[in-house]
Amino acid sequence: MSRTILKIPVSSPRMLASAIGVALSAGSAAHLAQAAENTEPKGERNPISLGATNITGQDQDNTSYQVEKASSQKYTAPLVDTPRSVTVVPQQVLKDTAATSLQDALRTVPGITFGAGEGGNPQGDRPFIRGFDAQGDTYLDGVRDTGGQSREIFDIESIEVSKGPNSSFGGRGSAGGSLNLVSKTPQARDFTNGGFTYGSDQTRRCVLDVNRQFLDDSAAFRLNLMSHEQNVAGRDAVNYDRWGVAPSLTFGLGTPTRVNLSYYHMESDDLPDSGMPYGYGSTASNAAHVHDKPTDGGDSSNFYGLKSRDFRKTRADISTVSIEHDLNDNMTLKNTLRHGSTGQDYVLTQPDDSQHNVNQFGTVWRRANSRVSTTTTTTNQTDLFGNFQLAGMKHSYSTGLEFTGEETRVSGYTVSPNSNPVCNVSKGGMGGNCTSLSNPNPDDAWNGNVARNYNGTNTKATSRAAYVFDTIELDPKWLLNVGLRYDTFDTQANTNAATGRTKLKDDSQFFNWQAGLVWKPTENGSIYTSYATSASPVGGLVGEGQEPNGFVTGINTSDLEPEETVNYELGTKWDLFHDRLSLTAAVFRTEKKNTRILVSSNTFENGGESRVDGLELSASGKITDQWQVFAGYSYLKSELVDPGRIGNRQNVVSAGSNKGNQMPNTPKNSFSLWTTYDITPKLTVGGGAFYVDEVYGDAGNTVYVPSYTRYDAMASYKLTKNVDLQLNVQNLTDKTYYDKAYSAHFANQAAGRTALLTTSFHF
């Protein structure tokens, strides 16, 4: 085999791990020696945390799972008075569950699933919120974070999940909701925290979190480091290797003017896993999927990739400058400037069944998918927020302007041979392009070639927006929450292919709003009703994914309008047990209208509709001083009301329809429960149960992944004032289940039983 590969540089994470180890060892020795000489109690410190190896400071008093207010100034009221469903996954939940990635963290939030990536849909995070694709609706500290990524959380303090359409908050997209990742920032205290995690399947993770004040405590520097490598429990050959660094610097702590500078860098080098092929309910050579689930040939550890061919390398670089000034006691002006660049480079095996090899011959075609992509984004966001009194009513407001430029370049590799072979041969046949369903060998020799193909697509987008939010206290028992946003979104895609060049463009303008009325029968509770909208214009993902309203080569899409989503919601929120436990309940209807549908060959119209009726419940916080819980339930009744014709634009099926089918990636029922109990001041035990109903991968409801229940357990023990031990066992029963469904061909299998032991240091 020969291949020419454009590599995204990935430095050795072992060097970073060694550096973390040296720093921790030196710091531990110095502080332990000091502790031996001086046993006087130190001043109170706030919680400090480190992702999966979260370490808390001394005399911790903020380990609750309850969060009272979102970080973004666009939320102009505490969560109990916010008329929409918002779930915040706090640092303590990330620590206790040993989460290391965004997908790990969101397991604790029911109603969210993840879709699988391929070639056109990039590998990485592809969340579905309330049944709607949200891969372009992730924000970092309130600024859209574009580009296909598998996000780490070593530098993340909390994750905010806003459910329901909310284009008034972030602009385009957000049909089902959005995610906001809150970064760790410099603090007004000194600390050094670190952790080593050793686990099954050669898991090794090191983290370091250092914060230091200087300039007479008016400035602070914080540094987060991470090194992570692991194989995957229950999966042959698959491995993940990544490292990251995130320095940040703040000037003006405790003063009216504050300046924050931050940088985030992460690289990964993986042998990726696309999981298992779907089986067919029939052995006929021309069988179509009817109601088929993945098949592993009798061994759930089977891996259908090739070590000699497959790889995935990623990188992310994000630089941010934020300046905040208090104009007076009731008004603050803030400007955030960010430049980000993310990249992916991969060739991976898709266990393909399109030639019916699985059911006819018991074999799998190792189809090669590839991608080389780079996304750059520059955003400037200016916000003015505060509060004032007018006509006897209190206003808590936030208003701002946003300007963003985005560009994505996508190309790939030419992999040959990569045609659709009929694999009527034994494993390793066809030059390694075919393998056995029941006994694949990832070490098979592959007699092919991988060469860089620079033909691809360059997509650019420019957006401009103005927005305003206000919570008006009509009287002590009634609140009115409103939000308005106006966007212009101009995008252009230039395609360079062997058949020639094409140029597509679209200019959209859209207005979104939200309104909610809140009644507070008591100070610690509320009952609300709300309405919110979102808009998804043509090309909203800027080339980073296959979207329902994306550009179509050879078709005029300039006349297509933004897809529109509306949400009606009725809910209630209560803070009980001395305001330490938050309980919420909501019923809602989300309707996506004006969706683009296929009506005939090469003809699309804005005439489709889909709908989700749902119920959500949640609980977060402390039941007693020793016992706390983070739990939720989601019921989603989804329906494709008018999905248009079946088929693709060149091959339209004249008869038949998916009308009335369940929406893909939308479980009817999902449930999560995580709870811990402090048996003694030093010993804590906990556990979790996570249930997800059957999920369809396609609009035709012909392929699906079965429902599953996963159980986790944890125990932590404080060895000393400065050293903790924590044991986590994830997927306690070693359940074989699938956590990502693709519309055809395959589904991703989740990890088996994984044990993790973390030693944490905090000074």
What are these regions (language model features)?
Residues 154-157, 168-245, 253-257, 317, ...:
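Outer-membrane beta-barrel translocator/receptor signature
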Residues 25, 50-189, 534, 570:
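Acidic, small-polar-rich N-terminal luminal/periplasmic segments of exported/outer-membrane proteins
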Residues 319-341, 368-494:
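Face-selective signature of the C-terminal outer-membrane beta-barrel domain
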Residues 250-254, 375, 394-396, 400-406, ...:
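Structural signature of Gram-negative outer-membrane beta-barrels, strongest in the C-terminal barrel
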Residues 228-233, 240, 245-326, 341-375, ...:
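Acidic/polar loop-and-plug regions of large Gram-negative outer-membrane beta-barrel proteins
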Residues 690-698, 716-763:
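C-terminal beta-signal and adjacent terminal beta-strands/loops
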Residues 589-591, 606-699, 733, 760-762:
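Gram-negative outer-membrane beta-barrel transporters
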Residues 323-328, 332-338, 342-348, 527-528, ...:
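Membrane-embedded beta-barrel scaffold of Gram-negative outer-membrane proteins
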